[in-house]
């Protein structure tokens, strides 16, 4: 368990908390428990117990509080990708696999503020395309155009050719993302404490294809051998980059993102709650 929290940065949800009721509740609970709260300057006048702060100040807070579902948390991780802060997701969404506590969170939130919580570290992947590097916490998906034929590509691991494929695409997933799109494509569920990357084909032409788990430290190289239309790579289902024939994706493991957890066995409890 960690030490008592000294400062939190609150990332408001302008869609699901448009009246700032939940944001004010979080700031008020922090104030009542001796914890400073900061929020972006633009919305500081809407939150009584939070001070306005710059992006750098938000990024350097001890803990970043995110209101919403898994998608909102992923967006915050992308926005603050180089932070050393821990992320706490408060679930106002649907599935809530990454978020830790529900919106009626008073007791659990006070517990966390007083230092009674754990940290789980989640591997990210860095994807380099044509000199630009992108980061994903869940997955990177190379996929065909919506109206085109299959995309063709080759896969190499650690400099060694593994296979060539014609498919609707391929998902390169972290263990955290193994319960997301990769799972829908038939990929395995991988405990997030395992440092590995999962390769799962999407509707491959070869029906004998199987997912492959690659250990941390081995570079994965995807070479696009045939792509038409708006074939693209998506990162965590949000950022999209178009690709063309001849493009090469170099994928390596990146830094770890810290998520706040109330329970040490959160992963298997969440599996039981959400999937079984």
In which residue ranges do the predicted regions lie?
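Short glycine/serine/threonine-rich phosphate/pyrophosphate-binding segments
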Residues: 19-20, 71-76, 179-184
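Catalytic core of DAGKc-family lipid kinases
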Residues: 95-168
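Gly/Ser/Thr-rich active-site loops/lids in small-molecule metabolic enzymes
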Residues: 163-167, 172-208
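ATP/nucleoside-binding phosphotransfer catalytic cores, i.e., glycine-rich phosphate-binding loops
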Residues: 134, 142, 147, 157-161, ...
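A residue-level signal for conserved active-site and pocket-lining positions in enzyme catalytic cores
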Residues: 13, 65, 69, 91, ...
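ATP/NTP phosphate-donor binding region
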Residues: 1-63, 103-118, 128-134
């Amino acid at each position: 368990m960690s030490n008592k929290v000294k400062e939190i940065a609150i990332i408001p949800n302008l869609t699901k908390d448009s009246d700032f009721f939940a944001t004010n509740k979080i700031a008020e609970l922090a104030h009542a428990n001796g914890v400073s709260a900061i929020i972006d300057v633009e919305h500081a006048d809407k939150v009584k117990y939070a001070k306005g702060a710059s992006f750098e100040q938000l990024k350097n807070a001890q803990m970043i509080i995110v209101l919403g579902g898994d998608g909102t948390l992923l967006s915050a991780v992308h926005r603050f990708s180089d932070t050393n802060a821990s992320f706490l997701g408060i679930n106002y969404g649907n599935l809530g696999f990454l978020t830790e506590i529900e919106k009626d969170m008073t007791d659990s939130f006070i517990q966390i503020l007083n230092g009674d919580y754990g940290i789980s570290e989640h591997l990210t992947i860095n994807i380099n395309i044509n000199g630009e590097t992108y980061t994903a916490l869940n997955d990177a998906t190379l996929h065909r155009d919506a109206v085109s034929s299959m995309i063709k590509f080759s896969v190499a691991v650690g400099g060694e050719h593994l296979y060539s494929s014609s498919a609707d695409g391929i998902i390169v997933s972290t263990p955290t993302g193994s319960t997301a799109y990769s799972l829908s494509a038939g990929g395995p569920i991988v405990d997030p404490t395992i440092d590995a990357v999962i390769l799962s084909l999407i509707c491959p032409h070869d029906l004998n294809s199987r997912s492959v788990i690659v250990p941390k430290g081995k570079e994965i190289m995807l070479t696009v051998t045939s792509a038409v239309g708006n074939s693209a790579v998506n990162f965590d289902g949000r950022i999209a980059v178009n690709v063309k024939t001849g493009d090469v994706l170099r994928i390596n493991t990146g830094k770890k993102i810290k998520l706040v957890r109330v329970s040490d066995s959160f992963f298997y409890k969440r599996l039981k709650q959400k999937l079984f």
